[in-house]
A protein has these predicted regions:
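Membrane-interface "cap" regions at the ends of multi-pass membrane proteins
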Residues: 2-79, 230-236, 255-263, 479-487
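Hydrophobic, membrane-embedded alpha-helices of multi-pass small-molecule transporters
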Residues: 49-66, 207-214, 223-288, 307-326, ...
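Hydrophobic alpha-helical segments and their helix-loop junctions in multi-pass secondary transporters
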Residues: 148-151, 198-222, 239-244, 284-291, ...
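Juxtamembrane transmembrane-helix boundary signature
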Residues: 85-119, 129-143, 477-479
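C-terminal membrane-solvent junction of multi-pass transporters and transport-like membrane proteins
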Residues: 39, 387-471, 485
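Hydrophobic, small-residue-rich membrane helices and short re-entrant helix-turn-helix hairpins
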Residues: 45-49, 183-196, 245-276, 294-300, ...
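Transmembrane alpha-helical segments of multi-pass small-molecule transport proteins
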Residues: 128, 156-183, 197-208, 235-248, ...
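Membrane-water interface regions at transmembrane-helix termini and the short interhelical loops
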Residues: 74-76, 102, 118, 126, ...
């Protein structure tokens, strides 16, 4: 018998359920999910789009998103300018995430597999690698913040902050995250409800202590950009990068829905969950950044809190990073499978966890956290925006009609193209990345066009999406129409 068949036989369904999530023997809560990238068969489909609300709310209403909002104030924006950037960036990014979620019910597979239709099965490898690096990198970025908080907690307990404490903190943080993600989809979705409930209580506690001290007329510090508009666009880009960094995850959490699930419902619930989390965390983050230097948030923020709230504050950081990384690890595991690494899904999660542990150790001992975070945000935006544009325009051109089995058929089929590569699409993606880099302004790369001609404005998000989307529409429109006519 095939190992998956034996696993299906011995799998024990969860004895308890979370409201809104159906018990399923192929995807049980606190049991090993048996599916990897293979299309979810109709008999294993389950769930409701409202699950997406809790998934994205639980995964994003946390300290790491709060820190993202704080970057807008660190860039020199006033409080109200920063809040406007949070609203505009949050709405725009959440719309894109919602749209990218519709593939799940149609194809029953992970997001990164769906772009095989545009790139070809072999041509999809470069973007699959980008997606995997993005997810794995976010595991490390979040883990670094959690490790710093755990080290502070160890100091409170009188254990010091020596090398042994740091290594133990890394191990505890990564093992806890991997333990949840390796179970699979149902466990991840169910756990995010719990993550949100605890995070909300702790984060709103921070807000209660901060509100009486807020200077609502805060005018901002020294601007990072050379013009007010350029500075605001820089802040907008950072907020937009948050939801955009999840678009390669979107269908991973909607793929178990039934094939006839309305697309509007999928879009709405994913959009709402991401938007609410971004706005709530954005409000708290911008307010706190006007009161304390957030360049080192774990060390500086406790200065404005009562002494007794230090431990709950540190738990906010650890808990939120875990909630975020459970999603990251699950998708990174699927991403590794998309690179044709022939291991079970749970083993892929463990492998990603090991790699992230190494990256976290490097960051904890040798690198400034906020520099790492800002650079990773900008790189994520530049590499994923062009890919997201191709994903969405391809959906529009095909009217959402995909051959789910052909997405996994090597050597033949409508998505095989020439030796499995659709070279025009790869060229469009490369052009989109170049267009984004050409007008980027970040700690990673500041283009001469941005600094000299645009007043420091970072237009990489607009350039990456618009240029790539238009080019792909022009290049692929006729190709897809011709293929449809032959079918």
């Amino acid at each position: 018998m095939h190992p998956l068949g034996r696993l299906r036989e011995v799998e024990v369904a969860a004895v308890s359920d979370v409201k809104g999530h159906e018990i399923n023997s192929a995807d049980p809560i606190f049991g090993i999910e048996i599916h990897g990238l293979d299309p979810i068969p109709p008999e294993d489909a389950h769930g409701h789009p409202s699950e997406l609300f809790w998934t994205w709310l639980g995964g994003n209403f946390n300290y790491i998103v709060l820190t993202t909002a704080a970057l807008t104030v660190l860039f020199g924006l006033s409080l109200w300018q920063a809040l406007l950037a949070v609203v505009v960036g949050g709405v725009a990014g959440s719309v894109v995430l919602g749209l990218c979620s519709v593939f799940g019910p149609r194809t029953g597979t992970a997001t990164i597999v769906n772009t095989r239709a545009a790139f070809g099965l072999n041509g999809n490898f470069p973007v699959a690698l980008v997606s995997w690096l993005s997810a794995s990198g976010w595991v490390a970025v979040n883990s670094v913040l959690a490790v710093f908080a755990l080290i502070e907690l160890a100091q409170v307990a009188g254990l010091g902050n020596g090398v042994a404490v740091k290594i133990a903190s890394v191990a505890i943080v990564l093992l806890g995250q991997v333990a949840i993600a390796l179970f699979g989809h149902a466990t991840v979705v169910a756990s995010e409800r719990i993550f949100f409930a605890v995070s909300a209580a702790l984060i709103f506690g921070l807000l209660l202590f901060a509100l009486p001290k807020v200077n609502w007329a805060y005018a901002g510090g020294p601007p990072l950009g050379s013009t007010p508009l350029g500075n605001w666009l820089l802040g907008l880009s950072v907020i937009f990068a948050g939801p955009i960094s999840w678009i390669n995850y979107a269908s991973d959490y909607s793929r178990y829905f039934r094939r006839d699930t309305p697309s509007r419902s999928v879009i709405f619930w994913a959009f709402l969950g991401m938007l609410v989390s971004t706005l709530l965390a954005g409000l708290v983050g911008t307010v706190l950044a006007t009161l304390v230097d957030m360049s080192n948030p774990v060390a500086n923020l406790p200065k404005i809190l009562p002494g007794w709230y230090l431990v709950p504050f540190l738990l906010v950081v650890i808990w939120g990073a875990t909630a975020n990384n459970v999603l990251n690890l699950y998708t990174a595991g699927l991403g590794l499978l998309a690179l044709r690494i022939t291991v079970p899904r749970w083993a892929a999660v463990c492998l990603v966890g090991a790699i992230a542990t190494a990256l976290t150790v490097i960051a904890v001992f040798f690198y400034n956290f906020m520099s790492l975070y800002a650079e990773w945000l900008s790189l994520t935006l530049i590499l994923l925006c062009p890919w997201g544009a191709i994903l969405l325009v391809d959906w529009y051109l095909r009217r959402g009609s995909y051959d789910a089995q052909a997405l996994h058929r090597w050597g033949s089929g409508p998505y095989w193209y020439r030796s499995g590569i659709n070279w025009p699409t790869l060229a469009v993606y490369a052009a989109g990345v170049v267009a984004a880099f050409a007008v980027a302004n970040s700690t990673l790369w500041a283009s001469p066009i941005s600094t000299r001609l645009l007043g420091g404005a970072d237009l990489s998000l607009f350039s990456g999406l618009i240029v790539t989307g238009l080019l792909y529409y022009l290049v692929a429109g006729r190709q897809i129409a011709a293929a449809a006519a032959k079918a």
